[in-house]
């Protein structure tokens, strides 16, 4: 067969005409075309690299030929894989947004900061807005406390201060204007509506809640409470009772508040587990039971996600564990259930009763007679983008009227910290 077909003669001609220097080119070309055909067999469009059906557009054909010759096998494979990864990124990966150049919109940002410094609606009390810069949208604040110290009452004060346009001031003996009214949703998980309402009336009128509950008014207190009731009636302040809630319930109620009332500020009282959350998490995890600290972290994470997704402000709270009694540096380690709750918050503080040891350590400051004797201390342990953290605000408190008044600031070592009382005034719809 070999001789009949003159194979020896054919091999000699091939040897004479062969160009060894071109071998690598044609071998590489063969591998590139084989690669493209392999992708094509799996239904992947590779015509953006090489289109064999293009016979009319000679310029495009020549350009693709040149690119194919000048591209390595690895580069061609990477071009195709990049397109596949882009599809996965858009439709499979649960990630939103893209990377931007660091200077993108930088001058617009500076112009905006010149007109609108970063601040939110003011919270109640002196010094607190210096520390927090107000209730900023897209931020999650956590204010924890031991039972009976005032976490609910302090949030009642803040919610009313944001939503109501007048409060009673004993200093002037009259009602004073309180800026504009911002829509607020107060989610209560333990108290019912009536309990929340009497605390709100007490704060606005500066009348002790017991006087309201027992209908035992002094002087003009009844008139002040009636005026406070009128203010509440006309304010965009909404109460939602949610005693047994899931993560989805919290998000749904906030979405409903945004949709129905244009709510921008949410107070959630407070972070703890419930039967419904346990059932929801067990169902989502395929029957695997998670520890309480993991569940509480998930709730905290959900609240922060809601802040970012819907552009709202959220404040919540937690109980404390037993270590708070002896702690010299009250921080996230005192949060009941899981210190990881604080990982997602933008501002974290803890309310504690002032102890005798505190007063002894404060003798030098209190001896100046510049401040009243404090009854509550507020430890600020976390403050993103804030100057003041690792400090204590010393307050005088009247929990009967839900009013906690910071007076001065110290380090954890009781050293006085200079601090100005910044006032935030909103005279038009908040731009924050």
Question: Each predicted region: which residue ranges?
Answer:
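Accessory, often N-terminal, substrate/partner-engagement and coupling regions
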Residues: 1-83
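The Walker A/P-loop phosphate-binding site
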Residues: 92-207
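C-terminal regions of RecA-like/P-loop NTPase motor modules
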Residues: 247-263, 308-310, 322-432
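Cytosolic-facing regulatory segments adjacent to core modules
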Residues: 122, 129-131, 165-262, 388, ...
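Structural motif
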Residues: 142, 264-267, 315, 349
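Short, contiguous acidic/charged loop-to-helix segments that flank catalytic cores in large enzymes
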Residues: 146, 241-244, 276-297, 323-341, ...
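Phosphate-binding/switch loop-helix module in NTP-utilizing enzymes
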Residues: 237-306
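Structural recognition of the conserved hydrophobic beta-strand(s) that form the central parallel beta-sheet
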Residues: 186, 267-268, 312-318
């Amino acid at each position: 067969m070999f001789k009949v077909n003159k194979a020896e003669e054919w091999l000699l001609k091939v040897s004479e005409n062969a160009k060894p220097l071109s071998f690598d080119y044609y071998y590489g070309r063969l591998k590139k075309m084989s690669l493209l055909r392999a992708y094509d067999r799996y239904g992947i469009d590779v015509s953006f690299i090489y289109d064999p059906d293009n016979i009319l557009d000679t310029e495009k054909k020549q350009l693709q030929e040149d690119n194919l010759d000048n591209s390595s096998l690895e580069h061609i494979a990477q071009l195709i894989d990049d397109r596949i990864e882009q599809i996965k990124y858009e439709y499979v990966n649960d990630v939103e947004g893209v990377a931007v150049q660091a200077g993108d919109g930088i001058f617009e940002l500076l112009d905006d900061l010149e007109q609108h410094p970063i601040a939110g609606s003011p919270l109640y009390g002196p010094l607190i807005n210096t520390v927090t810069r107000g209730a900023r949208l897209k931020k999650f604040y956590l204010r924890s406390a031991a039972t009976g110290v005032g976490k609910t009452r302090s949030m009642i004060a803040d919610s009313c201060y944001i939503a109501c346009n007048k409060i009673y001031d004993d200093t002037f003996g009259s009602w004073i204007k309180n800026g504009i009214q911002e829509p607020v949703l107060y989610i209560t998980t333990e108290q019912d509506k009536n309990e929340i309402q009497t605390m709100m009336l007490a704060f606005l009128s500066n009348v002790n809640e017991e006087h309201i509950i027992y209908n035992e008014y002094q002087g003009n207190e009844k008139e002040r409470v009636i005026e406070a009731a009128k203010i509440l009636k006309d304010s965009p302040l909404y109460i939602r009772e949610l005693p047994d809630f899931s993560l989805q319930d919290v998000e749904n109620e906030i979405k409903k508040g945004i949709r129905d009332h244009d709510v921008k500020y949410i107070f959630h009282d407070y972070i703890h587990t419930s039967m419904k959350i346990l059932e929801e998490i067990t169902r989502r995890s395929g029957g695997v039971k998670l520890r309480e600290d993991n569940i509480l972290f998930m709730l905290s994470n959900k609240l922060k996600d809601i802040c970012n997704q819907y552009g709202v402000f959220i404040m919540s709270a937690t109980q404390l564990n037993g270590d708070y009694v002896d702690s010299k540096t009250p921080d996230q380690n005192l949060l009941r259930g899981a210190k990881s709750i604080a990982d997602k918050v933008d501002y974290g503080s803890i309310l504690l009763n002032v102890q005798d040891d505190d007063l002894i350590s404060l003798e030098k400051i209190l001896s100046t007679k510049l401040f009243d004797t404090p009854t509550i201390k507020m430890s600020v342990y976390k403050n993103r983008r804030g100057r003041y953290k690792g400090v204590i605000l010393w307050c005088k408190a009247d929990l009967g009227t839900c009013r906690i008044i910071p007076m001065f600031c110290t380090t954890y070592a009781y050293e006085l910290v200079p601090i100005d009382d910044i006032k935030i005034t909103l005279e038009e719809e908040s731009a924050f």
